[in-house]
Structures are given as C-alpha cells and as structure tokens.
Amino acid sequence: MSEDLSKLHTSRMNKLQRKLRGEVGKAIGDYNMIEEGDRVMCCLSGGKDSYAMLDILLNLQQRAPIKFEIVAVNLDQKQPGFPEEVLPAYLDTLNVPYHIIEKDTYSVVREKIPEGQKTCSLCSRLRRGTLYGFAQKIGATKIALGHHRDDIIETLFLNMFFAGKQKAMPPKLLSDDGANMVIRPLAYSREKDIAEYAELKAFPIIPCNLCGSQENLKRAEVKDMLNLWDEHHPGRIESIFTAMQNTSPSQGVDREQFDFNSLQRDADAPLRGDVAESDLPAFDFVDVANNGHIDLDAAAKSRSENKIDIVSTYTP
C-alpha cells in the first residue's frame, strides 16, 4: 500500500471510529447500559458486528468517567470447520480477559431438527441459554450483544409483516427470569458503517454459515426492502428509527397500551378546539343551536372580535 493510500486508510478508519464511538457512547448514556463497577460480558461470534462492538467498548473503557470490566466470551458450538484458533489468537493481541466455551449444540440441533428444515431458531435458543448461564457463573452484570440499528428496524418489520406484532429489539432487555441484563451498545449504529470499519480494521472474520444453514429468507426480504428505501429515499431509515423512539399509545389502537374504555369527555371544558388548532385564535361562536355551516374564513375579517357567525343552518 502506498503512503498516500495508507494515510487515507488511517484517516477514514479514525473518522469511522469516532463516529461509532460517539453513537455507542450516546446509546450507553441514553439507556443507562453500563454503570460503575459493571462486569460486561461481550459475546463474540467472530462476525463483523461483535468484533466492532468489542473494539469500540475497549476504546470507550479507556475514556469513560466510570470504571467497568470487559470480559470477551465466545461459544464454540462445534460446527464443522469452525476455526478454533482464530478468536484466541486475536484476543491475545488485545490483552483482554476472555473465555472460550465449548458446547456441542450443533449435534443437538441436528438430532432435533429434520433434514432440510431451518435450524436457526433452536440453535439460537441453545446459544442464549448457555451464554445466560455462563454470565451468572462469572459474575457478569451485563451481557453485550452486537445487534445494530438495522437489526432493530428489520426485526420491527419482520414482526409486523409476519407475526402481527409491533415489536422490535430493545437496546436494553431484562431476561425473562430477571437474572440477566442484555445490552446492545450498537443500537444507534448503521450496519454499513460497521461493515466498513471491520474491513478497515481487518478483523479476522469467521463465516456465519458453517452449519450449512441458509439466510433467513424473510429477514433477507425485509433487508432488501429497507436497502431500497435507503437508496431511493435518503433519510427514511433514520426517520423510522426516530419514530420508534417517539411512540404515542393514545394515538394507536392497542388496548393493552392505552385504556380507551376509560376515556371521558369533560363537559365543563372551555370551547377552545383541539390541541392541533392551538396556533389558531380561540373563537366565540355566536350561535350553535342548530347544525350548520360555520364560516371559519370569517376569522380573517374579524380578528379583533374573534367571533364567527353561523352563515347557514339545516334542521331535518
């Protein structure tokens, strides 16, 4: 690599690192992901996302105003062809505490799932159970996963399209048994930034399809849809994620999220219109005894009085 290309490479890598560090730092702050004295178990799969997460967290650890530990953990599920030497060799260069757990979940999955059917769901449950149990064994107070913003948005649409649920992937989650706290520090980061950063850093990526499974076709379909939107409508993905952070249960239709049955109008409320009309003058209606047509344009002619006459009425 020429000197100019090397400088360009380093400059771009540093710029991306600053961006990712800022996003991760903001996510941690917004959701109180990491606290003083935490032992954070970083789950490392060998993919670009978990490598980037560990790299950024180690970087932030040196700058953070609080003290916390980082322990890297990989689960070797005994998939055929898994390069066992890659992760230990990489982690040794970081001088970070780590554990490699060996558990043959691959054989369990093959035994339980008929040939030709997808194994991802059972494999994921077995992996999650093992990691949750190990987190308690080593005294980890937080379990960090490498899911990013694109994963969160894709999950929302997957659940909407195929499960009839408005449910995504939260940046912070308490496990069902209440024993483990899961965090997703990359919740504000885009996959394309992470992919570029991983390439520039030359992380030793391990293929994720060693088990022979196919990519989830439904997720791939949603990902293609979102990529198309991102290409033709810049800013739409950002707007979707912003909307996910600004929900209003009273403006939806979920009866579990808002008690519509208890809504009662206030008979004594002043006639001031709706909040949506708050920028308009508050009018005194001269006569509303009969159903009729009210000339709201009259306001422009009589702003000093703020009174509107009934210009026509109809009584059936």
Curated annotation (Swiss-Prot):
Residue stretches in coiled coil: none
Record-listed E.C. numbers: 2.8.1.-
Metabolic or biological pathway, per its Swiss-Prot or TrEMBL entry: tRNA modification
CDD domains reported in the protein's UniProt record: TtcA-like
Cofactor(s) needed for function: Mg(2+); [4Fe-4S] cluster
Gene Ontology CC annotations of this record: cytoplasm
Record: residues binding [4Fe-4S] cluster: C120, C123, C211
Known catalytic reactions: cytidine(32) in tRNA + S-sulfanyl-L-cysteinyl-[cysteine desulfurase] + AH2 + ATP = 2-thiocytidine(32) in tRNA + L-cysteinyl-[cysteine desulfurase] + A + AMP + diphosphate + H(+)
Broad class of the protein's primary localization: cytoplasm
Cellular localization per UniProt: Cytoplasm
UniProt xrefs under InterPro entries: Rossmann-like_a/b/a_fold, TilS/TtcA_N, tRNA_Cyd_32_2_STrfase, tRNA_thiolation_TtcA_Ctu1
Free-text cofactor note: Binds 1 [4Fe-4S] cluster per subunit. The cluster is chelated by three Cys residues, the fourth Fe has a free coordination site that may bind a sulfur atom transferred from the persulfide of IscS.
S-S pairs: none
Pfam families associated with the record: ATP_bind_3
Gene3D superfamilies documented for this protein: HUPs (3.40.50.620)
BP GO terms, sorted: tRNA thio-modification
Residue interval(s) of motif PP-loop motif: 45-50
Keywords (A to Z) from UniProt: 4Fe-4S, ATP-binding, Cytoplasm, Iron, Iron-sulfur, Magnesium, Metal-binding, Nucleotide-binding, RNA-binding, Transferase, tRNA processing, tRNA-binding
GO molecular function (one): sulfurtransferase activity
Family recorded in the similarity comment: Belongs to the TtcA family.
Task performed by this protein: Catalyzes the ATP-dependent 2-thiolation of cytidine in position 32 of tRNA, to form 2-thiocytidine (s(2)C32). The sulfur atoms are provided by the cysteine/cysteine desulfurase (IscS) system.
Subunit structure: Homodimer.
Other comments on record: The thiolation reaction likely consists of two steps: a first activation step by ATP to form an adenylated intermediate of the target base of tRNA, and a second nucleophilic substitution step of the sulfur (S) atom supplied by the hydrosulfide attached to the Fe-S cluster.
Protein name: tRNA-cytidine(32) 2-sulfurtransferase
Organism of provenance: Shewanella sediminis (strain HAW-EB3)
Species lineage: Bacteria, Pseudomonadati, Pseudomonadota, Gammaproteobacteria, Alteromonadales
Gene: ttcA
